[in-house]
Amino acid sequence: MGWIRGRRSRHSWEMSEFHNYNLDLKKSDFSTRWQKQRCPVVKSKCRENASPFFFCCFIAVAMGIRFIIMVTIWSAVFLNSLFNQEVQIPLTESYCGPCPKNWICYKNNCYQFFDESKNWYESQASCMSQNASLLKVYSKEDQDLLKLVKSYHWMGLVHIPTNGSWQWEDGSILSPNLLTIIEMQKGDCALYASSFKGYIENCSTPNTYICMQRTV
């Protein structure tokens, strides 16, 4: 009887252990199956969430590239128009009067810039043939457009060796502080350049010239 009771007791213990082990296996199997079932769901949700996200990223990148291209194009157009725009000569309300065709009318004076190169005497003759004279600078205020001139042009200013003065074609003396005379080389004639500067030049040297006609 003791032996049978011992076997029953051991059997009960084994059954208990088996039952516990079986429960552990079931729990482990359930956990594994739950994870396997959960993973596809999670992956599916990830894919569902990732697809709109990457689509949005793609749209954002495309719009960014398009914006950069548009900015580049507009910048190029703006710079091109900026560097190619013509210099506008300011106009005043003062009466200018009639000028020859294609001449510039500004503050009661008519101006023409000639691109052909002539010596001083030939330039003077060309202006006289058009009822005008070589440029005479008499006022920085009334002739402020001359600040726009960038190259050298003959003007009607000559040096008088006998008294060392500079005179205009009409015989008037150059007013002090009106022009800065710069000796570029030996000569008795003067070229006009920018910022009210006069450059001494040999009268026989070919240069472009400016003709001027008073309207009053």
From Swiss-Prot:
Disulphide connectivity of cysteines: 96-105, 99-110, 127-211, 189-203
Ribosomal protein in keyword set: no
Molecular-function annotations in GO: carbohydrate binding; identical protein binding; MHC class I protein binding; MHC class Ib receptor activity; signaling receptor activity
Tissue-wise expression: Expressed in natural killer (NK) cells, CD8(+) alpha-beta and gamma-delta T-cells. Expressed on essentially all CD56+CD3- NK cells from freshly isolated PBMC. Expressed in interferon-producing killer dendritic cells (IKDCs).
Quaternary assembly: Homodimer; disulfide-linked. Heterohexamer composed of two subunits of KLRK1 and four subunits of HCST/DAP10. Interacts (via transmembrane domain) with HCST/DAP10 (via transmembrane domain); the interaction is required for KLRK1 NK cell surface and induces NK cell-mediated cytotoxicity. Does not interact with TYROBP. Interacts with CEACAM1; recruits PTPN6 that dephosphorylates VAV1.
InterPro entries to which the protein is assigned, alphabetical: C-type_lectin-like, C-type_lectin-like/link_sf, CTDL_fold, NKG2D, NKR-like_CTLD
Protein's UniProt name: NKG2-D type II integral membrane protein
UniProt topological domain (Extracellular) ranges: 73-216
Domain C-type lectin, first and last residues per copy: 98-213
Alphabetized UniProt keyword annotations: Adaptive immunity, Cell membrane, Differentiation, Disulfide bond, Glycoprotein, Immunity, Innate immunity, Lectin, Membrane, Receptor, Signal-anchor, Transmembrane, Transmembrane helix
Short name of one Pfam family: Lectin_C
Stated induction or repression of this protein's expression: Up-regulated by interleukin IL15 in primary NK cells.
Record field: transmembrane: 52-72
UniProt subcellular location: Cell membrane
GO cellular component, one term: plasma membrane
GO terms of biological process kind: adaptive immune response; cell differentiation; cellular response to lipopolysaccharide; defense response to Gram-positive bacterium; natural killer cell activation; natural killer cell mediated cytotoxicity; negative regulation of GTPase activity; negative regulation of natural killer cell chemotaxis
Residues bearing glycans: 131, 163, 202
Cytoplasmic side: 1-51
Additional information: Is not capable of signal transduction by itself, but operates through the adapter protein HCST. Some families of ligands for human and mouse KLRK1 receptors have been characterized being very similar in structure and highly likely to be orthologs. In humans, an additional distinct subfamily of ligands (MICA and MICB) differs structurally, having an extra MHC alpha 3-like domain.
Purpose: Functions as an activating and costimulatory receptor involved in immunosurveillance upon binding to various cellular stress-inducible ligands displayed at the surface of autologous tumor cells and virus-infected cells. Provides both stimulatory and costimulatory innate immune responses on activated killer (NK) cells, leading to cytotoxic activity. Acts as a costimulatory receptor for T-cell receptor (TCR) in CD8(+) T-cell-mediated adaptive immune responses by amplifying T-cell activation. Stimulates perforin-mediated elimination of ligand-expressing tumor cells.
